[in-house]
Amino acid sequence: MEQPEDMASLSEFDSLAGSIPATKVEITVSCRNLLDKDMFSKSDPLCVMYTQGMENKQWREFGRTEVIDNTLNPDFVRKFIVDYFFEEKQNLRFDLYDVDSKSPDLSKHDFLGQAFCTLGEIVGSPGSRLEKPLTIGAFSLNSRTGKPMPAVSNGGVPGKKCGTIILSAEELSNCRDVATMQFCANKLDKKDFFGKSDPFLVFYRSNEDGTFTICHKTEVMKNTLNPVWQTFSIPVRALCNGDYDRTIKVEVYDWDRDGSHDFIGEFTTSYRELARGQSQFNIYEVVNPKKKMKKKKYVNSGTVTLLSFAVESECTFLDYIKGGTQINFTVAIDFTASNGNPSQSTSLHYMSPYQLNAYALALTAVGEIIQHYDSDKMFPALGFGAKLPPDGRVSHEFPLNGNQENPSCCGIDGILEAYHRSLRTVQLYGPTNFAPVVTHVARNAAAVQDGSQYSVLLIITDGVISDMAQTKEAIVNAAKLPMSIIIVGVGQAEFDAMVELDGDDVRISSRGKLAERDIVQFVPFRDYVDRTGNHVLSMARLARDVLAEIPDQLVSYMKAQGIRPRPPPAAPTHSPSQSPARTPPASPLHTHI
C-alpha cells in the first residue's frame, strides 16, 4: 500500500457543483445617428466597453473596438467576448468617442455619448438584440489635462439626442458542444492486499492561474486491473473552457470503502488530443511521480486508452431565450403572524426608512436579474397567510395589488409598492400554506406548454410549512410543467422541511409518485446576511445561488418535451438614410476578458 500522502478523501471528488464555467457570448456593437464632431467630415467613431466590479463598483475598461473612419452609423467588426452568468447582474457601460489622433488616451478624443445596461438585458431582449439611446452624462474635468471628461454616473442631459447604440449577443458555438468519450485501462498497479484494484478516473480542467478544477469522475470498476469504464458525456466548456489546447489532467485512483482512495498515477492530455479519437496518440502512460523519483527502473503504473470520442452541439438556455422563450416571474410573500407586528422594529416585515427588510432585499436581488427575461415586465405578486378586509377572510392566494382579476405589478418597484400597501391593509394570520400559490402558478404554466413561456415562482417565507403533504403533491404535479420554484427562508426558524422540498439529495414524491424533475431551490436568508452591512454583495451571492439552477431546469424541461428552440426573430432593417458607411470587412477581431 502507498503512504498516506497518496490517499485522497471521497469528499474531494464529490463536490462537482459549480465546476462548469459560464458560457461565453460575443457582443457586437453598432450605432446609428451619432453626433458629428468633425468640421469638414463625419466622425471617426470608437466604442469602449467597461465592466463593473461587484464589490467596489469601480468601472474597468474591458476592451475597445476598431476606429471606423468618416461615419455616423458604424457597424464595428471587433467583438467583445464575455463570460455569461444568468444568475448574476453583470453591469456594462459603452462609451463612444470621435477619434482625432492615434493617441490611446481617451481624454484626447471627443466624447459622443454613453449607454448603460446589463448583459442580461442584451441577452433577454428579442433576438438578443438591444437598442438604447446614447446620452451625454454629467462632465468632470480631467485632473491632468483640464479637458471635460464624461462622468461614470448614469446621468444625461435632458433632450440631448446623441444617437442610438445597438448591442447584439451571440453565444460562441464551442460553448454548446458536448463531448462523449470512453476509456479503458491496462495493467494498472495492484493496490489491495486481498484482491485487485477498484479503479476510477478523475478529470481536472486547468485554470489560468495554474491550478486545477475537478470536472468529471467516472464510476468505480470493482476488482480489476484492466477496467473498461462506461461512456460519459461532458460539456466542452467544462472540460477546457473553450480552449482546445488547455491542459486536462487525469488521475487514476483505487477506490477504498473508508474514503482513503489510493493514488495509482496520472497523465495529461488536451481537448485537441482527445478529438483525434482512438489512435496511438491517445494511449497514455499512467505515471506516479513519487515512484518515478524513487525507482530507477520504474516505467509506469499502467496505461489508459481512449476507446471512442465524439462531439455534438446541444441546444442551450441562450438558444431558447434568443428564440423568444419568456420567463414569467411570480412572487409569493408570507403574511403569517409569526413574522411579527409590521409596526414594530423586531418584525421581519418592518419597513425602516433607512433600509429594506429581508423580504424586500430577497425580492429585489432575484427580481432585478430575472426581470430582463420578461418583455412586458408585468409580474404577478401574491400573498398568503393573512386575513383580508373587509370580512377578515383568511387567504393563501391573494393579489398584493388588490386586483383579483389581474395580480400583475409593473416591474420590481411595482411589486415592492404593492407589498408595502398590503402590509397596511391586511392582518397577519396563518397558517403557512404553500400549495395554493404553487397550484396558482402551475395552472398558468399548464396553459402554455409549447416552449414559448417558462414560469419561475419565488416564495419568501419565515416559517415552518403547515401543508407539507399538499405542497409535495403540488410540486410533483408541477415538475412536469414549464416552471421552477425558488424558496427563500427569512428569520431564525428551522427550515428542515424546505430542505426536503429542495430535493437535491432525495427527489420528492407524493402518494408514491416521484417528481419528474428537481424544480425547487431553497436557501436560508440568514446565510447571506452581511454583518458589515454590505447588502449589495451579500444579495448578489443570494441571487447567484438561487438562480444558478434555472437555466438547466428550463433546458431539461424542453428536452423532456422534445421542444427545439425557435429561430430568433429577424432584426429590424434600417431605412437607407440610416445605412452605415461600412468599413470593408476585415478578418474577425475579438476582445477577450
From Swiss-Prot:
Its main location: other. The modification Phosphoserine is found at S19, S103, S140. Ca(2+) 5 binds at D192, D254, D256, D262. Residues 572-581 have a biased composition (Low complexity). One of its GO terms (cellular component) is extracellular exosome. GO terms for biological process: cell differentiation; cellular response to calcium ion; positive regulation of dendrite extension. Keywords: Calcium, Cell projection, Differentiation, Metal-binding, Phosphoprotein, Repeat. Residues 328-554 form the VWFA domain. Ca(2+) 2 binds at D38, D98, D100, D110. Ca(2+) 4 binds at D192, D198, D254, D256. It comes from Homo sapiens. Ca(2+) 3 binds at D100, S103, K108, D110. Ca(2+) 1 binds at D38, D44, D98, D100. It comes from the Eukaryota. This is Copine-5. Probable calcium-dependent phospholipid-binding protein that may play a role in calcium-mediated intracellular processes. Plays a role in dendrite formation by melanocytes. Its cofactor is Ca(2+). The lineage of its organism: Eukaryota, Metazoa, Chordata, Craniata, Vertebrata.
